[in-house]
Amino acid sequence: MSANWIAGAAVRVDADDLAQVQPALAGVSRQAWRSFALMVGTVLLIGLVLPWFSNAYWIKTLTSALALSVAAAGVAVLYGQLGLVSLCQYALLGAGGWAALRVSHGLAWPFELCVLVGGVTSCAIGMLAGLPALRMKGLYLALVTMMMAGGFQVVINVFGFPDGGAGWLGKVQGSERLLMVRPAVAPSDAAYLRYVAVWLAAVLALIELHRRTRAGRSWALIRRGDAAAIAAGVNILRYQTWAFGLAGFCAGVGGALLAGAVGQLDGRAFAASESVMMFALTVVGGVTHWAGALIAGLLLRAVPALLTDFGVNGYLAMIFFGAALLHALITAPSGVAGQLVGALAALRARLNRARHSAP
Amino acid sequence: MNLSALPALRLVAALIAVAASGAAFGQAKCGLNTGKAAAGEPIMIGAVVGKTGPDDFSASAQAAAAYFKCVNANGGINGRPVEYIVADDQWNPETAAQVASKLVKDRKVVVLAGNTSFVECGANAKMYADEGVMVIAGTGVPRECFFAKNYVPINSGPRISATIAAMYAAKTYQSKRMVCIIPNIPSLGNWGCEGAKAWGKANGVEVETIAIDPGSADATSTMLQAAAKKPDTIIMHMPKGLLVPMMAAAEQQGMGKKIHFVSSAPAYNADVPKAIGPYWNKNFAVNLEFNPLSAAGPDNKNWQAVLDQFGAKSDPRDTFSQAGYVAARLVTETLLKMDPKKIDRASVSDALRKVSDFRSDILCKPFYVGSGNRHNANNSGPMAIVDGNGFANVPGGCVTADDPELVDVRADELKLGLK
Amino acid sequence: MDELLPFLISGLGVGAVYAMSGVGLVVLYRSSGVLNFAFGALGAIGAYVAWSLLEHDWPQALAWAAAVLTSVLLSLAYGRWLAPKLAPRDPTIRSIGTLGFALVVLGFTEWTWGEQPRRLVLPTDSLAFEFALAGGDVRLTYTRALGLLLALLMMAAVALLLSRTRVGLKMRALANDRDLSALLGIRVLQVDTVAWLLSGAFAGVCGLLLANIVRLQATLLTFLVIPAFAAAIVGRLRSLPATVAGGIVIGVLEAMAIKMPGFAPFRTATPFLIALAMILMARGNERPA
């Protein structure tokens, strides 16, 4: 049916219609760029303002949260745009972090370059991980990616993360483990928080640009079905693999930023369950709106930190988390971001009504 | 006997009993022992422990907290009370960095005492050095805890512990071929058995290492692999949670009859003999990092008294607790020698580095800190053997580890004028 | 080859573990379309309940029954009360819901019992089959042999249930198309109850045996569900005999891998590698057009 519509329908356009369509299109385009600017502006503003209100504990926590938001944005692209489940994002984060650490310690490259190396590494691995997706149904793909995360867990526990040594693995023997060198423009914790916010804004902008161009349209068609996509002339292999690559890039950048925040990464923190939690909390945050990735990062790091700060027993916090996850899944199908956006829209509508009905 | 005198006699008997029990526990002694509560400006002391995770290491901070409570009830630090803040790093290096930042940069602690964590040494040692704050840790585990300028563990550490266990096996069982099983955790798996190996090389004993994945579901294959190397002693070198299923697997394969089993310090815990069962009765020797929990020395008794009077009933009375008590006592006695108005981070760190003859019957030898680049002052310990549902002491007392890696520590000891 | 035989036998114990868990997972998937991440957690809490009761000198059989009852009740609670609320969502979200439940159960278990080294001893531990092999002596305890037997029995029982009983037919219909089945008059709640009850019972039995064969530690037992998924994948989430065979093969290969010089440190990755290999080789499960 959709194939017929695209290929067969002929539409007659006359001058009147064009005169109405063009300003409408311009209006929509303006609106789109406005929301784009709003997104970038909000993230940069958050990054600027947060260090003023946070003590050292919260600066570190929120830096981790923003780094994980970068990775969560990648998960949101795959699930929100294409409906594909990736349960190995945290493993890709680890792979990116590994590459960034190795390059930073071994070649002493500038931090930005290390982050890009991390991103590109995870992009490549992500594209490989996405190859099974060409033949798999939803839950099966989820299981495949979970198996990959399990494999990564074992490998990284054997290899460990680079900490200043030589050789392929870069592990130091017999002397002090080194911390990753921070970027020259942001050595302090507060400055680094702002730096990570800039990267988050850049990554979100990159994703948004994808969504608004041919890539986004191709993804929407692929989501409707292979036949629709092929009939429209979309190269499924290229665009689907590219989506996995983009998600991997987000994970790699997030991993490099996390490595820079803490200084070291530890293999024990990369269990397969972390990838599953990241997917779960990204869904809770919301996969269609950019704020969902931000909320996912906060849920992953800031909420547990809050509970720890209040001295809540770690296991009671786990119970609370599980219950909150269930509750969010049940009551908020479009995620917390969806609920917030809906609430904002309702508020705006009510204000507009009040303004219009006022004498 | 006059019936009317019975109640009075009972009362007298009760009073005598109370006095006797009081004498058995002893009154907890700490700090200035004035019996008066301290009420000055608080001194901030912090601790980072691994509580939520594969194991709960918070006993050392609990013991230190009890000691500091006792100090506060007994005149404080020359009138100033101690405010002791404990943070849980949840076995995650990221969280460890966050909570250490909170303690050092937000709460501005002057020293940390009673830390016990698997992950915080690696994550925080550099920050502690950069901020000039000393850590008198309860228990250190991975290598980074024993190779940091500002981190001073009270315990001897896994490498020393396994070395002493190997030395015991060679002496008692004339063992010439040993296998050391250790989890492949970074900075532990490639370090913990190396002391035994190096000692063995210099003494004609062959020691091989098997590194295991702590998340593995298959303990039997590991024990079979160890047995296939035909050792006469197996050195178990892992946390007690991993130890119990491996000993169970060894028992099911009947290995206790052919091979001697010894372990490093983590096995010295009240729950272990019951969990591993009667098969290992008198068949499993364990190294201790401190003197036994039931030793009769006055400081050991004081530790128990402090916990009874100022700790919670649920606080474990284990070796982590001993370590936390000793750490808190060391910090308290150092602070007491300082001018209470001049207690800040720099002066406290200075004073701590000068500690050179701290004695406690919990420790085998006098403890010191010094200005070296690393700290491993406790490098001796006794052995105990599993007996029924508990442990029995082994003759021989404290054994000093003969680990070639300790050469720089011995040099530091000479510099401080110790033997 | 001689050196590998002892490990083949010791691998059968772990293999039985994976096989049983795999069957438990596939059963629920085939009847409700949900991958149960809480399978391990439900088994773990059952095992801890059994341990506590045995510590208080309860008779063995009652302790085991209490363990299985705990798992069944918790599973029913989720299946009847929480799972229906997620019913309109897609299968992945429904499976993530069980993850939330797993965290609640795991957190409760760890908080209640704490981290003390424990061992769940079963009476079948003291008896064993002895093998004196060239590569070394090996003993296969009755518990592990029992695990193997139970895996096969469970597989046969579930296969019978699904193919020969009315309830089984209804379960298969529900897994196929829930809405259509409801329209046809199948009482959805009733069938769901049976499915979650069965899954809970399997979880309880698996939990007891797992706690004995592996380790009585809640977090480890909960996340052993991930390698168990590997066994389920070998069975394509459909075939129970293939799941059991897959689980046993995975266990045996993981044990034998200890003898491969370069691969030994990575041997815990064996379940994942085998699952990935199976998926890449499988030709089915084409994407819908």
Describe each model-derived feature in a short phrase:
Chain B
Residues 28-34, 56-62, 74-145, 154, ...:
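Beta-alpha junction/loop-to-helix N-cap segments that form part of ligand/metal-binding clefts
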Residues 31-65, 87-94, 116-117, 181-191, ...:
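Extracytoplasmic "Venus flytrap"
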